Amino acid sequence: MFPEKFLWGVAQSGFQFEMGDKLRRNIDTNTDWWHWVRDKTNIEKGLVSGDLPEEGINNYELYEKDHEIARKLGLNAYRIGIEWSRIFPWPTTFIDVDYSYNESYNLIEDVKITKDTLEELDEIANKREVAYYRSVINSLRSKGFKVIVNLNHFTLPYWLHDPIEARERALTNKRNGWVNPRTVIEFAKYAAYIAYKFGDIVDMWSTFNEPMVVVELGYLAPYSGFPPGVLNPEAAKLAILHMINAHALAYRQIKKFDTEKADKDSKEPAEVGIIYNNIGVAYPKDPNDSKDVKAAENDNFFHSGLFFEAIHKGKLNIEFDGETFIDAPYLKGNDWIGVNYYTREVVTYQEPMFPSIPLITFKGVQGYGYACRPGTLSKDDRPVSDIGWELYPEGMYDSIVEAHKYGVPVYVTENGIADSKDILRPYYIASHIKMTEKAFEDGYEVKGYFHWALTDNFEWALGFRMRFGLYEVNLITKERIPREKSVSIFREIVANNGVTKKIEEELLRG
């Protein structure tokens, strides 16, 4: 069982949940993903579903209802995202700031953002959206929820990233997202402004959600359905470095401009972390084959170690080989790690795929982890979800243990399953929380568990087909319909601060 102050919550993002109002007053056309999912070429090639986010669940108008549903589940925490493109639908690039540049490694060591800068930003910010997000956060706080605010969940403002043009011009356009160092500077401005406007009601911040997904699927997997859909390892390297750099700058800006405790029991006014997936959950196909073992080690370092060594130790693996590090103390700064866990990876060795990224000597094995056929059994005879992800709860334990190596508090910030018929979800929830308990009992403290998700939502390139919600959503009426078995199981676990013997006997034994 978990302690009394353990955080039980749900997680959501902006783009996936907000849109769907009948009159289309609250759509956000100023984001790269808005343009990406409706691109004719993407739809014709089957890279995206053709579903459109403006047909979505309308959390923008129905947030009070969703908060009340969460309260009745017994939850005490809620993770939300703020959409950069809603706050700044227009460019902030003309607002000048001084910055120091490390010419040896093309990284920005510091950005000088002042109160005058914030006042300039305030003049062009969308006040309606600032007021909206304050209303959302205050709604949560009034119901007793601890709020985590995440600043970036895959999307970028369209004025920074035109993914169609980036693809067609092979990233030579100016609006080329994380390949461009100006995105780093603009992110620092955005983070400073959000801390300035919301610091009085927020104490827990995350800079990014799963930054390596943006990099790997956008620049190394052109058929993934993620923008900009190019194969360019040099661009991938730049994007990784720039997102590490952006985290570090945002960390310092949030600390600088959020100086007020929102909650009396908070450790400090601003606890700034990062939400991350695939932490230490790559396993060798053959544990007795030294090459497969090394492939798994490289996979784990590429997906999490590369980022974490930089932001926790100030050590940057500039050659992307897992061995050659430079001292970059200006990149150091992170207060907590959010573990997002869904399934494992099983990998085998292959010769380096890209000469400029020596770490990529791993190849996923079909039939395990993320690489399964939906609705079947994996090669390990484990159930597989609607999205084709194997149920492997042991990976939750391993991911928590790996995250603990960096000496900061750990939270489970996403965990869930695409299961439209609610057949596998009850077992999934119970088994993964049980593994979280096991980690806690073994001395690896976990401070919270956030389920993905309260409701069905827009699953990026896959649209509305993948149903992750504890509550089904009718996309016509927007009605929230409980998936009774899972809702009951989760409510009972939350009420008892852990998996009860009754649930264990019903779902986890035999």
UniProtKB/Swiss-Prot annotation:
GO biological process, one term: carbohydrate metabolic process
Keywords from the named record: Glycosidase, Hydrolase
Active site: 210, 414
Keyword Hydrolase listed: yes
Entry-linked Gene3D superfamilies: Glycosidases (3.20.20.80)
Thermal response of activity: This enzyme is thermostable.
EC number: 3.2.1.23
InterPro entries, alphabetized: Beta-galactosidase, Glyco_hydro_1, Glyco_hydro_1_AS, Glyco_hydro_1_N_CS, Glycoside_hydrolase_SF
Reactions catalysed, as given in the entry: Hydrolysis of terminal non-reducing beta-D-galactose residues in beta-D-galactosides
GO molecular function: beta-galactosidase activity; beta-glucosidase activity
Stored PROSITE patterns: GLYCOSYL_HYDROL_F1_1, GLYCOSYL_HYDROL_F1_2
Family, similarity comment: Belongs to the glycosyl hydrolase 1 family.
Record protein name field: Beta-galactosidase
